[in-house]
UniProtKB/Swiss-Prot annotation:
A motif (Nuclear localization signal) lies at residues 26-32. The modification Asymmetric dimethylarginine is found at R408. Belongs to the primate lentivirus group gag polyprotein family. Residues 12-19 are annotated as: Interaction with host AP3D1. It comes from Human immunodeficiency virus type 1 group M subtype J (isolate SE9280). GO terms for molecular function: RNA binding; structural molecule activity; zinc ion binding. Residues 189-227 are annotated as: Interaction with host PPIA/CYPA and NUP153. The lineage of its organism: Viruses, Riboviria, Pararnavirae, Artverviricota, Revtraviricetes. GO terms for cellular component: host cell nucleus; host cell plasma membrane; host multivesicular body; membrane; viral nucleocapsid; virion membrane. Gene3D superfamilies: 1.10.1200.30, 6.10.250.390, Human Immunodeficiency Virus Type 1 Capsid Protein, Immunodeficiency lentiviruses, gag gene matrix protein p17, Single helix bin, Zinc finger, CCHC-type. PANTHER family: ENDOGENOUS RETROVIRUS GROUP K MEMBER 24 GAG POLYPROTEIN-RELATED, PTHR40389:SF4. The gene is gag. This is Gag polyprotein. HIV-1 lineages are divided in three main groups, M (for Major), O (for Outlier), and N (for New, or Non-M, Non-O). The vast majority of strains found worldwide belong to the group M. Group O seems to be endemic to and largely confined to Cameroon and neighboring countries in West Central Africa, where these viruses represent a small minority of HIV-1 strains. The group N is represented by a limited number of isolates from Cameroonian persons. The group M is further subdivided in 9 clades or subtypes (A to D, F to H, J and K).
Length: 497
């Protein structure tokens, strides 16, 4: 404990023990607080020996300050103790821990202002920008460094592989950083094919150059000695200006960024070319029934990059069309998320939609709903449907004959005759010809009602015995079919007479 307590001695220790832990409190700092701080530093893998000097305390404060917002109470207490100890080392008069924290904050703000001022002075004293490809030689003069073959090869490879896809524009912007108009023309001249696109690009550059000449007219009078002439539209395009003039405009005071201006014109023309090479409109991007939502979002934003619209319009397209053109499964999920959902939430919610697992789950839910609906409908039908019964005794509805209170009817309930019951009633309903349907106990109506007569000659013709009189068929037929004569329906037949 003696080694840990030897951090302060003499007058500094007396000053330490006069400082209160809290404003207006009775408790004051003691040697045990130094011992505790030393152990905590050891626990946090920090050197406890840093507490012996003001510089060491400052280093500890720098290490602990980022953890104050998310740290535990022990870290905050350790920071307060080290801040108070720093004030004791610096002989700063304080009464409590709160004053020590305020002093530390003042010192940190002062150091930050000094650092910002030094950085500002450094920028003011700095030389002209040395961005590639304009660099300074040993004499401090700006000179041009040509584009490397590797850069040109990368640009040509992008055009060959991607043609004029939307990603060509950011690639061109990255490869042409700080380039002069001459460098930009070199990049455009390396494109062998796509001459129709190159002609469209030239037309756009000529239009922008004419607009530049209209907005920036030439001043009358001679040019003052030591001054550089103002660039025209053709100068910016690199057709009527030399490389030295371009460097002079870009490094002058004030500088005229002819390279950046020409670069904007080229990007404007590339946007038109990309729009031509991407004939698919953003309105035609729709999600397929089995297409994953992630692939649909990729196609959507690729087409959105090719759209020539402001950022506000593109934001509206993203908020509206992305949900509107999704398939029904994803659209149901996206509408449930609401209009304030982020793209990350949309992709997380629609993850797996369209796959076999999702299809099986949706089908199971649909079948469950249909089954429940049918069960409810069946229950409802059985509940609401009431069978209407009719009494055979009195003929009224609502009860059966067994429970009928009316006097019991004698005889058959169907024909009214006595001597038999309704189940044994032989009354049958006649058909449209007036024929009574045969009984169900007999032969069906489509069967012959009598046996057919044999066509063999009588026995007497064969000399086998006495003549057997054949039964008379006509009276029997009349008995079976008494009302089947056509005369009763259509009158006498003149042909039969």
């Amino acid at each position: 404990m003696g080694a840990r307590a030897s951090i302060l001695s003499g007058g500094k220790l007396d000053d330490w023990e006069k400082i209160r832990l809290r404003p207006g409190g009775k408790k004051k700092y003691r040697i045990k607080h130094l011992v505790w701080a030393s152990r905590e530093l050891d626990r946090f893998a920090l050197n406890p020996g840093l507490l012996e000097s003001a510089k060491g305390c400052q280093q500890i404060l720098v290490q602990l300050q980022p953890a104050l917002q998310t740290g535990t109470q022990e870290i905050k207490s350790l920071y307060n103790t080290v801040a108070t100890l720093y004030c004791v080392h610096q002989r700063i008069e304080i009464k409590d821990t709160m004053e020590a924290l305020e002093k530390i904050e003042e010192i940190q703000n002062k150091n930050k202002q000094q650092a910002q001022k030094a950085e500002t002075d450094k920028k003011d004293n700095s030389q002209v920008s040395q961005n590639y490809p304009i660099v300074q030689n040993l004499q401090g003069q700006p000179v041009h460094q040509a584009l490397s073959p590797r850069t040109l090869n990368a640009w040509v490879k992008v055009i060959e592989e991607k043609a004029f896809s939307p990603e060509v524009i950011p690639m061109f912007s990255a490869l042409s950083e700080g380039a002069t108009p001459q460098d930009l023309n070199t990049m455009l001249n390396t494109i062998g094919g796509h001459q129709a696109a190159m002609q469209m690009l030239k037309d756009t550059i000529n239009e922008e150059a004419a607009e530049w000449d209209r907005v920036h007219p030439v001043h009358a009078g001679p040019i003052a000695p030591g001054q550089v002439r103002e660039p025209r539209g053709s100068d910016i395009a690199g057709t009527t200006s030399t490389l030295q003039e371009q460097i002079g405009w870009m490094t002058g005071n004030p500088p005229i960024p002819v390279g950046e201006i020409y670069k904007r014109w080229i990007i404007l023309g590339l946007n038109k070319i990309v729009r031509m090479y991407s004939p698919v409109s953003i309105l035609d991007i729709r999600q397929g029934p089995k297409e994953p939502f992630r692939d649909y979002v990729d196609r959507f934003f690729k087409a959105l990059r090719a759209e020539q619209a402001t950022q506000d319009v593109k934001n509206w397209m993203t908020d509206t069309l992305l949900v509107q053109n999704a398939n029904p499964d994803c659209k149901t999920i996206l509408k449930a998320l609401g209009s304030g959902a982020t793209l990350e939430e949309m992709m997380t919610a629609c993850q797996g939609v369209g796959g076999p697992g999702h299809k099986a789950r949706v089908l199971a839910e649909a079948m469950s709903q249909v089954t429940n609906t049918n069960i409810m409908m069946q229950r409802g039908n059985f509940r609401d449907h009431k069978r209407i019964v009719k009494c055979f005794n009195c003929g009224k509805q609502g009860h059966i004959a067994k429970n009928c209170r009316a006097p019991r009817k004698k005889g058959c309930w169907k024909c009214g005759k006595e001597g038999h019951q309704m189940k044994d009633c032989t009354e049958r309903q006649a058909n449209f010809l007036g024929k009574i349907w045969p009984s169900s106990k007999g032969r069906p109506g489509n069967f012959l009602q009598s046996r057919p007569e044999p066509t063999a000659p009588p026995a007497e013709s064969l000399g086998l015995g006495e003549e057997i009189p054949s039964p008379k068929q006509e009276p029997k037929d009349k008995e079976l079919y008494p009302l089947t004569s056509l005369k009763s329906l259509f009158g006498s037949d003149p042909l039969s007479q």
